[in-house]
Amino acid sequence: MLQMKQPLQNLNQSQKTALAGVFVLLFPILYPNLFSPLGRASPSLFSEWNAPRPRHLSLLQGALDRQISIRQQVELWSPLADQGWKPCTESYRGASLPEKSEGFLQVFLDGGLNQQRMGICDAVAVAKIMNVTLVIPRLEVNTVWQDSSSFTDIFDLDHFISVLKDEVRIVRELPIQYAWSTRDYYATGIRATRIKTAPVHASAEWYLENVLPIIQSYGIAAVAPFSHRLAFDNLPESIQRLRCKVNFEALNFVPHIRELGDALVHRLRNPPSSSQTSGTMDPTDRINTIVKAGAGKFAVLHLRFDKDMAAHSGCDFEGGKAEKLALAKYRQVIWQGRVLNSQFTDEELRNKGRCPLTPEEIGLLLSALGFSNNTRLYLASHQVYGGEARISTLRKLFPGIENKKSLASAEELADVQGKASLMAAVDYYVSMKSDIFISASPGNMHNALQAHRAYLNLKTIRPNMILLGQVFVNKSLDWSEFEGAVMNGHKNRQGQLRLRKQKQSIYTYPAPDCMCKVA
């Protein structure tokens, strides 16, 4: 033993430092699980969160023991009845295009896929208002998602131009004399053709008075930022319907996204045979099992529970002190600490319905609404904060959870892998094909899909966030009381059409602007 120690004692300080450095480099390789906070098993020793345990144990047990009647299943999966409204954009015929365009309009769109989608609709409307030619919008790289996908990477450009050819002039790129008008050009100084001061929800008159004169003087104007830069009210009916025509008819995803989406939908509707429908099962039981499972049907759950959402909410998600510190640091870095919710307690936020539903809570909601554990449930999400440990309770309630990676091969996903906007586009496409859609928290994707599905009269469940926040805070409720409260609180939140009110978004409520009452 002394002979083994002697060489170490003879090492000088620099040699010891080098040896320690090698050990630090090798440590993660020798013990990788300690550095894998998003692994399927558990958080790491150096994770920023602790594995959350179920917050609602009694409700969870009640959900696992629940009995769901066939009648309840049939009602749940039945399509919406005709509500007396139909899309109007197809019957709309705008005024013919003037012979001459006033010039070119460029817009630069930030945000995620659905915020950019709304910006594209607004850009077409603004171009129509000013009688200018729209250059295909430039999609900025989002600071959170880090996706550099362009318009043509996501949307079918030929279809877009064809659908709108009688409404607005659209060009793929600027003529050579305006080739200087680029993002880099506007990033390096003050430019006369750049409009940085477009107010949020600007009126049509604002564009005619402030942007059109620049286009008439220089032949072009670039508006950036442009997100949410057109009002929802006091616009001509033709402009409102044009926005919906862009949103619901002109914006088709590129073929490879649609093909992948169709493949996923087919696999969701036609799962492999399982033991539950094989063997010597009694024919009556076999029929009941098929009915209970909603044969050939599936629901999509948009589970927006990424770090960005968790941090911005200011809520506590049972990840311990490490998680609280990590989310506080994230708020400081991203928003310089200016997050309104951070001044309230967790209980106050939950009572006001301001906390996004955790995977556990959305699982309990689905169970109370009558979804059985046989439900084919497609999970539309980018990345769940807390990884598999956070989803484990939801998976316990619904073993049939699927997502892109479980349904498709690596080869099939190659064109979208690592590209947040393309992955979101696939989720959007699958969501539009589902029998039922439900989102765990408000947001742009929730709003966009709620509107699109309302436009087509498809069933969409809108969680009552205030009610749910209050019942989850109330630890005295048993399962039957919780189930009753949830059912009563969601009777009129399963796709019933709601008319847009003043100042509300046309991209959330398409009626009555884009829909007509059927006589």
UniProtKB/Swiss-Prot annotation:
Q: Which residues are glycosylated?
A: 131, 373, 474
Pfam families tied to this protein: O-FucT
Spell out the InterPro entries in the cross-references: FucosylTrfase_pln (IPR024709), GDP-Fuc_O-FucTrfase (IPR019378), GT106_glycosyltransferase (IPR052272)
Subcellular location per UniProt equals:
Membrane
Task: Provide the coiled-coil residue spans.
Answer: none
Question: Would you tell me the Gene Ontology cellular component terms?
Answer: Golgi cis cisterna; membrane
Q: Where are the transmembrane segments?
A: 18-38
Provide the top EC class.
Answer: transferase
Pathway info: Glycan metabolism
Give the way it sits in the membrane.
Single-pass type II membrane protein
Among the GO molecular function terms of this UniProt record, one is: glycosyltransferase activity
Swiss-Prot/TrEMBL GO biological process terms: fucose metabolic process
In this chain, substrate is annotated as bound at 302-304
Report the domain of life of the source organism. Eukaryota
Alphabetically ordered keywords of this record: Carbohydrate metabolism, Fucose metabolism, Glycoprotein, Glycosyltransferase, Membrane, Signal-anchor, Transferase, Transmembrane, Transmembrane helix
EC number(s) per UniProt?
Answer: 2.4.1.-
Please give the chief subcellular localization of this protein.
membrane
UniProt similarity note: Belongs to the glycosyltransferase GT106 family.
Q: Which PANTHER family match?
A: O-FUCOSYLTRANSFERASE 2-RELATED, O-FUCOSYLTRANSFERASE 31
This chain's protein is named O-fucosyltransferase 31
